[in-house]
């Protein structure tokens, strides 16, 4: 994972994550193998901001049935990133 864009997959846009944006906390889906230091460096490189804190949440895959066969959805990892007070805000809704 040498590329920052391989670590950060997409922003997570939910009701809770939009409320956290008011406190300069942004939520991203990240690669499951990435650690907090790699996530921090990737966000700072892509968006040119200063990150003060990174919290991560691991989700295991859910069991899904297809007829008599059981499969699993992929596991995923979510990162909640706190920006410094002097950092610019990130705008995901630009076209």
UniProtKB/Swiss-Prot annotation:
One biological process term in Gene Ontology: translation
MF GO annotations: rRNA binding; structural constituent of ribosome
One GO cellular component term: ribosome
Keywords assigned: Ribonucleoprotein, Ribosomal protein, RNA-binding, rRNA-binding
InterPro entries: Nucleotide-bd_a/b_plait_sf, Ribosomal_uL23-like, Ribosomal_uL23/eL15/eS24_sf
Function: One of the early assembly proteins it binds 23S rRNA. One of the proteins that surrounds the polypeptide exit tunnel on the outside of the ribosome. Forms the main docking site for trigger factor binding to the ribosome.
Quaternary context: Part of the 50S ribosomal subunit. Contacts protein L29, and trigger factor when it is bound to the ribosome.
Family, per entry: Belongs to the universal ribosomal protein uL23 family.
Name listed for the protein in its UniProt record: Large ribosomal subunit protein uL23
The organism of origin for this protein: Shouchella clausii (strain KSM-K16) (Alkalihalobacillus clausii)
Encoding gene per record: rplW
């Amino acid at each position: 994972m040498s590329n920052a864009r391989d670590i950060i997959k997409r922003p997570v846009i939910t009701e809770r994550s939009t409320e956290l944006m008011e406190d300069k906390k942004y939520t991203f889906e990240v690669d499951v193998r990435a650690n907090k230091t790699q996530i921090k460096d990737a966000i700072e490189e892509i968006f040119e901001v200063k990150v003060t804190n990174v919290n991560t949440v691991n989700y295991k895959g859910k069991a899904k049935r297809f007829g008599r066969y059981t499969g699993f959805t992929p596991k995923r990892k979510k990162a909640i990133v706190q920006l410094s007070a002097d950092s610019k805000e990130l705008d995901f809704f630009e076209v």
